[in-house]
Amino acid sequence: MLRVPDECTYYKEDAGKFLVGAFELNAKPWGMDGIPDNFCFDQLPEDIDHFEPILEAAVNRLPILATAGIHTFFNGPESFTPDDRYLLGEAPELKNFFVAAGFNSVGIQSAGGAGMALAQWMDGGEAPFDLWDVDIRRMQPFQNSRTYLVERSKETLGLLYADHFPYRQFATARGLRRSALHEHLKAAGACFGEVAGWERANWFLPADAAERGEKAEYQYSWKRQNWFEYARIEHLAVRNDVGLFDMS
C-alpha cells in the first residue's frame, strides 16, 4: 500500500492487479436529484477528463504505469458528510432508530469502534462516552439545502488526504448564518470560523497589522500559526479588563 497525500492518490495490489485511486481536491457532486432505490455498488459513467490530472501524477510517481494499460476504469460514488464526521446515534425525530452512516471512506477502519459504541448506546440508552463530534443530532436543517450540499461536497472528499492542520476551517458554503454583530466584527478585523453554520469571530487582526498588508486569514501550519500573537493580546485584554463575546 502506497499513499501520496500531496498528490491525493493511493496505490495498492487488488485481486492480482494494480489499483490506483484518488481523493481529488475538487470533487464532483452526485445524487443531487435523488439516488435510485435499486442503486447498489453500481458504476457511474467514466470521466477521464476529471481523472486525468490524477493519472498524470500517478504516471510520474510510478513510470511503469505509462505502459501498463488500464484494465478497468471504475467511477463510483462515495458518501461524505458536510463536516467529514460520521452520522452516529439515535435519529432525533425517530425513537429507537439508530444510524451509523457517512463514514467518509474510513468505514472499514472505524467499524469496530463505531459498532461497539453504537451497541453500547442502544443497550444503555445513552452514549457510552462523549460522541457529540459524530452525533447525528448535530446536523442542522440548512445542511440539507441543495446549494449548500453542492458547494460543500466539492471540498469534503479532498480533505481526507489534505493536511489536517489545527483549527482548519471549511472554505465552501460559508456565510449562511450571521449574527447582528457580524459586520461590526468584520470591520474590527475579525477572522471568522464556522460553528453550526454560524460565522463566529475566532480572532482579530490588529489595525497596525492590517496597515502592514496582513489579512485576517488563517495561515495554517503545524507550528505556531499567524494568529497566535493576536490571540495572546486578546487574552490579556480580557483577563486584565473586560471583553464581549458573540456566541451565536
What are these regions (language model features)?
Residues F129-S248:
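Glycine/proline-enriched, intrinsically flexible loops and inter-domain linkers
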Residues Y10-K12, F18-A22, R200:
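Short hydrophobic-aromatic micro-motifs
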Residues D6, A15, P29, D37-R177:
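C-terminal catalytic lobe of FAD-dependent flavoproteins
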Residues V20, G69-I70, V99-A100, E194, ...:
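General beta-strand structural signal in soluble alpha/beta enzymes
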Residues C8-T9, V242:
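A generic local secondary-structure boundary/capping motif
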Residues K17-A22, F98-V99, R212-E217:
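Short, well-ordered strand-loop elements centered on a beta-strand within folded domains, enriched
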Residues F23-I35:
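Catalytic strand-loop segment that frames the active site of acyl-thioester-processing enzymes
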